[in-house]
Amino acid sequence: NPEGGTKNYVFSTHDTHSELCNAIRVVKGYRKEKWGYFLRAESFYNVATKEEEYGGIDSARYHERSHGEGFLALAQNNLQPNGLYLFDEPEAALSPQRQLTLLMEIYKCARKGAQFFIVTHSPILLGIPGADIYCFDDGKIHLCEYEETESYQITEMFINNREVLLDRLLKE
């Protein structure tokens, strides 16, 4: 489902299929995931509604929480060892503090055998220990170090040179 959820979620509130789905090929190997979840910050509301409907998870009450707290709870409730997880810009829903919480949850789950594919611009989530980071530069995909990512470099530049940077950016 392009909006998110498990492989069993079949719903669509808006046709958002990407051409990327035509370029992906699933290859079965020795390891089979026992659980999987696709989570996007932008379609959280729809997935949370279906999660409550499909799973009958009344106790989660995702819609009674703030966007970030509900998103984090949905992620936490669906992380399991030996799972396969696709997260699309999860930082869009989370404060820096909650990004650290998600980082801890991902790290703990990965140590128990889960695999994660995370598309992110967050220097916090890029910092997950042991993560392989792939950068997309000039139409090429390559492994890169944490400190080589644009997200890290821009954040570092802002923190270390905020006044100079803002002066240059906002100068009329």
Residue ranges and their predicted role:
Residues 91-92:
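Short loop immediately C-terminal to the Walker-B catalytic DE motif
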Residues 20, 24-26, 61, 73, ...:
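Conserved phosphate-binding elements of NTP-dependent enzyme cores
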Residues 1-53:
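ABC ATPase nucleotide-binding domain signature region
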Residues 88, 118-119:
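Conserved D-loop beta-strand region of ABC ATPase nucleotide-binding domains
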